Amino acid sequence: IITGIPEVDQLYKRSLLVFALMTNKRTGALLAAPEIDEQFTRCGRYAYCWGRDAAFIASALDCCGLAEAVENFYSWAANVQDEDGSWQQRFYMDGNLAPSWGLQIDEGGSIIWGILRHYSITKNMDFLRRMWPCVKKGVEFLTRYVDNETGLPWLSFDLWEERLGEHAYSSAAVCAGIEAGARIAELLGESTELAGKWREHAARLREAIFRNFWKPEWNRFIRSIRVKLNGWGEEHTDRKVWLKVNEKSIARDYTLEDGTLDISMLGLSVPFGLYAADDPHMTSTADILERQLKVNGTGGLMRYEYDNYIGGNPWVLTTLWAALYNIERKDYAKAREYFWWAVRGTTDQGLLPEQIDKLTGRPAWVIPLTWSHAMFVLVLDRLLEAGELLLQ
């Protein structure tokens, strides 16, 4: 990609360098971020491969024409998949299991969704055939891991790895993964009965997502239900209950509904496509998300209301996520505003951080974050495709 805009072209080249350095050429794993601080006071201990981050990163690699690296990653993912079809939280680059505190069901859905996305770009049927055993096991697990009362995926941690519950974003990822699996089965000429069963499950899940997460009185989606709240501080919810969890009378915070505004709710539309960007349910949700999560002065968007991780700064990937959504909504001016905010948030070495300090406006915490660079490439690719990349 060459745009003729120096800042953009330089950041694109830096992103290619980051992708190369964060890819294990022997195993195919994709590193979330390097560890640069032995005392862990300025970094987040991110030197692992997460299926979630990697699915977004692989999508960006495809935009860069790096198909071999993408296929190497998905081959790695197939090798580390559990026998029951699930994927654990995170791994070392050699495929060994890293320290974990719970299943994050969106990762499995994201990996299967990403496999189909790669095929849609490359049309590599051999790749699809190699992935079929992994896809079949993965989708079968996703269709089993169900809360029969809600119809949603059973309890798992959210994409921020903080709260155990049933989440809108995670449910959307699972739905997209199941639908992708059904399409892969059809493309390979596998059992039409199996593909049909999966599509029926995805259709029921779509209904459950709307039934559980749409709040007509608020005219927007909520992020989670049946949530065990994290123990790091007071949570902001109107429906909090205390539950005794053992005979020693230890109790924990739970909430029946978590209406906290969270940028991940955009995932219902981008990238997972359950709702069109101009669907009224999405536009009303997105409008309040962007309004309430914007950080005054510094700009950019926070992850969610009341976020207190590293002080609650705006994140690069969240702001670029909103850019992707606005491109689909054809609000290119807003998308460019978010895009250029991220471009101007690089370090002196041209690297994108995880966050921008809300007080100083300087790059903060993990540097570089591979997911941030991936989102930059994804937004750049879509703006160029739309012919809407203008010099700011």
Regions from the PLM with identified roles:
Residues 1-45, 125-126, 391:
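Acidic/polar, glycine-enriched structural segments that form the non-catalytic walls/loops
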Residues 7, 11, 167-172, 196-317:
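Extended ligand-binding clefts on enzyme/binding-domain cores
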Residues 16-26, 65-88, 131-152, 199-219, ...:
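Long, well-ordered core segments of solenoidal/helical folds
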Residues 36-43, 87-103, 148-166, 243-250, ...:
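Acidic/His metal-coordination segments adjacent to aromatic residues that form catalytic metal sites
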Residues 45-48, 98-106, 122, 126-133, ...:
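Alpha-helix capping and helix-loop boundary segments enriched in small/acidic/polar residues
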Residues 46, 57, 99-121, 233-247, ...:
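C-terminal capping/lid segments that line or modulate ligand- or cofactor-binding pockets
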Residues 46-148, 171-178, 372-383:
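Aromatic-rich carbohydrate-recognition surfaces in CAZymes
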Residues 118-129, 153, 180-200, 275:
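Inter-helical turn/loop segments and adjacent helix faces that build the functional surface
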